[in-house]
């Protein structure tokens, strides 16, 4: 992992406010189940986090930020208009965190924006934002 190769590397995660199972799990010190969850970032919507994944998050992820649905839509729109990228909601989470000024930026900062499986109606909604 990057942390093994260079322990000073900071790794951050981003989750939608409406489905922040790993944020709540970290807060409670154990994997939890949410009562309700929803987000346009449907690839990361989980009531319960993945049991196999949680220990890796605890070990390697320095912090997890949450972003709003408005920011996710704005990130999809920004990527499309200025980056010529079509991103689904989940793929736009890192950019949404940057737009909300939640990501600490320094030289060498990398944002991973991956995933373009977005419904045309959802993309149209984002483009109207």
Language model: regions and residue ranges:
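PLP-dependent amino-acid enzyme catalytic core
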Residues: 1-129
